[in-house]
């Protein structure tokens, strides 16, 4: 198991703990028991949205309830909770993104990451884009929406670890 590799570094005090990211529907008592044994400190969930309509349309494979249950378990186990969100997913609106941010706060997130939705070739989202069923946010909209949810997090004491993605090849601009 990969988590074993870093244990000597933790024992020597060179590393404090481990941060990892996973899907909300992967979290269970058994998984959390294992992660606790391996000195995991922070678990980030790729929630992306807390609107079931958006999650279904994007075929995320998890529901808002999955995020709620996983978040509750993570906090109950004493882990730091990170919840990642995306702005501009199919059927998203600025209001829905703000509601997702407020829900992330109410779930007790310690930190978050805000990502604008980007179209990557050979994905379901790219198919939707090419069919005309999805229109990505403009740069201006992505900045505005990200700023709005950022304010919600900062005013609520939730640490924002990142806004946006590193540029990379293969993205389709909107």
Q: In which residue ranges do the predicted regions lie?
A:
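A general secondary-structure junction signal
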Residues: 22, 116, 162-166
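Auxiliary Fe-S-binding modules of radical SAM enzymes
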Residues: 124, 131-174
